[in-house]
Amino acid sequence: MAKVSVLNVAVLENPSPFHSPFRFEISFECSEALSDDLEWKIIYVGSAESEEFDQILDSVLVGPVPAGRHMFVFQADAPNPSLIPETDAVGVTVVLITCTYHGQEFIRVGYYVNNEYPDPELRENPPPKPDFSQLQRNILASNPRVTRFHINWDNNPDSLEAIENQDPNVDFSLSLSCTPVKSLGLPSCIPGLLPENSMDCI
């Protein structure tokens, strides 16, 4: 049984200019005290073509964590535009929030992100080179994809084999804040950005 349950993730200040920080309010509950830190990460998927363009925007250690409910605001700087392929700068991508314990990832929350020019003229006639200063970032907060993974919470060698034989599963009990946003008109190829074993969780 998982010792940490993520209760809620709220996307703050959305939509925002591309260069604005990402901000998420995360609530979670520990069924018992954790002696070691939880490591939270925000990862920006720079391109669906290769993980080499993924950017870890920030990583924070939280702990030791006592039993009970906890909440914090996780803020990370915007991705480095120079590391994003120009062909992937405008359009739909993904931002991930992950959490690990003892180096084992036990939850991943993914959001589709649409980067577009709010100026109609720029949308119709985009510049040859992406102008990130004019882009707006819109996170599809109403449609997160949540995947949970079985991990060895106690570092007990006897349970490692059993855990390795278990597949990731979807946690339908996770209640995430749903902030209505305009439809992003996701192209049919975009779902491949998120793991196949992840599903919509409302």
Swiss-Prot record:
Residues in the signal sequence: none
Family: Belongs to the ASF1 family.
Origin species: Mus musculus
Entry-annotated residues carrying Phosphoserine: S198
Summary of the tissues where the protein is detected: Highly expressed in germ cells. Restricted to premeiotic to meiotic stages during spermatogenesis.
Subunit record text: Interacts with histone H3 (via C-terminus), including histone H3.1, H3.2 and H3.3, and histone H4; the interaction with H3 is direct. Interacts with the CHAF1A, CHAF1B and RBBP4 subunits of the CAF-1 complex. Interacts with HAT1, NASP and TAF1. Found in a soluble complex with NASP and histones H3 and H4; the interaction with NASP is probably indirect and mediated by H3-H4. Interacts with CDAN1. Found in a cytosolic complex with CDAN1, ASF1A, IPO4 and histones H3.1 and H4. Interacts with CREBBP.
GO cellular component, one term: cytosol
InterPro entries: ASF1-like, ASF1-like_sf
Gene Ontology molecular function terms on file: histone binding; histone chaperone activity
UniProt PTM comment: Phosphorylated by TLK2. Phosphorylated by TLK1.
Name the record gives this protein: Histone chaperone ASF1B
Region feature Interaction with histone H3 and CHAF1B, mapped onto this chain: 1-156
Function, in words: Histone chaperone that facilitates histone deposition and histone exchange and removal during nucleosome assembly and disassembly. Cooperates with chromatin assembly factor 1 (CAF-1) to promote replication-dependent chromatin assembly. Also involved in the nuclear import of the histone H3-H4 dimer together with importin-4 (IPO4): specifically recognizes and binds newly synthesized histones with the monomethylation of H3 'Lys-9' (H3K9me1) and diacetylation at 'Lys-5' and 'Lys-12' of H4 (H4K5ac and H4K12ac) marks in the cytosol.
Location in the cell: Nucleus; Cytoplasm, Cytosol
Biological-process GO terms, alphabetical: blastocyst hatching; nucleosome assembly
Effects seen without this gene: Mice are viable but display subfertility caused by altered gamete formation. The timing of meiotic entry and the subsequent gonad development is more severely impaired in female than in male mice. Increased perinatal lethality is also increased in the offspring of knockout females.
Keyword Plastid: no
Gene3D superfamilies from the UniProt entry: Histone chaperone ASF1-like
Keywords annotated in UniProt: Chaperone, Chromatin regulator, Cytoplasm, Nucleus, Phosphoprotein, Transcription, Transcription regulation
